[in-house]
Amino acid sequence: MADKPMIQLKDVSKIYDNGTVGLKDINLKINKGEFVVVVGLSGAGKSTLLRSINRLHDISSGDILIDGKSITNAKGKNLRELRRDIGMIFQNFNLVKRSSVLRNVLVGRVAYYPTWKTTFNLFTKEDKQKAYEALQKVDLADKVYARADELSGGQQQRVAIARVLMQNPKIILADEPTASLDPQTSVRVMNDLKMLNEKYGMTVVANLHSIELAQQFGKRVIGIRAGQVVYDGKMEDTPKSVFTDIYNGGDGNEGAE
């Protein structure tokens, strides 16, 4: 394990403008190479947690460190460099539907190019080859020139995973990556995330609705209820009753572990 956490949250709270508490007093350390699943009811704060780590949401108090550097107050170039190390995978795939699969995967390299080059699709031959190889790794090399909106939901999510592979981040934040997929396709997508974790050493934090997928793929499980961490432990040491408590445990007045 690394001496410093890859992700660290210190006393993090998020209160929305309407007064809704998104996160409350979160303290977490996630080390390099971990595969962490976050579980909880819809509205519990799972998405807020992930989006705060990448600073898609600004937190109300506390601090978030990425590989030892604060993202909370980072600006300009420093913020861009920190975000370059964080790949995001969303439940709605977040692809440019009318663009080719290849172009969507190349988006993973945008942070490494000046804006004018990406606007005119001026990617290097080397990066185009890397994009093709990334598609090979998720078994979509035959779709390289297809439009993204011609693909099935599962194929689109695998394009999103290839895009993250192209970005080569230290961290992958997957926000309900299987929510709109059938069970068989969900397992395929989770296996792709497992590949990125085990083969490339990327730290994965995934929000999941499915307890079965969480148990199958997670090495560590974090339970969120009403914006608080109510459980944090190794999956192999976590009895099924814990999941029942997380989903049926009331209003989340338990303190964070």
Curated annotation (Swiss-Prot):
GO MF term list: ABC-type phosphonate transporter activity; ATP binding; ATP hydrolysis activity
Q: Name one GO cellular component term.
A: plasma membrane
Its membrane topology is listed as: Peripheral membrane protein
Keywords from the UniProt entry: ATP-binding, Cell membrane, Membrane, Nucleotide-binding, Phosphonate transport, Translocase, Transport
| Endoplasmic reticulum among keywords | no
Which reactions does this protein catalyse? Answer: phosphonate(out) + ATP + H2O = phosphonate(in) + ADP + phosphate + H(+)
What compartments host this protein?
Answer: Cell membrane
Family to which the UniProt record says this protein belongs: Belongs to the ABC transporter superfamily. Phosphonates importer (TC 3.A.1.9.1) family.
Q: Give the PANTHER family listed for this entry.
A: AMINO ACID IMPORT ATP-BINDING PROTEIN (PTHR43166), PHOSPHONATES IMPORT ATP-BINDING PROTEIN PHNC (PTHR43166:SF6)
Q: How does it assemble?
A: The complex is composed of two ATP-binding proteins (PhnC), two transmembrane proteins (PhnE) and a solute-binding protein (PhnD).
UniProt cross-references to NCBIfam families, sorted A to Z: ABC_phnC
What this chain does, per the entry, is described as: Part of the ABC transporter complex PhnCDE involved in phosphonates import. Responsible for energy coupling to the transport system.
Official protein name in the record: Phosphonates import ATP-binding protein PhnC
Source organism per entry reads Lactobacillus acidophilus (strain ATCC 700396 / NCK56 / N2 / NCFM)
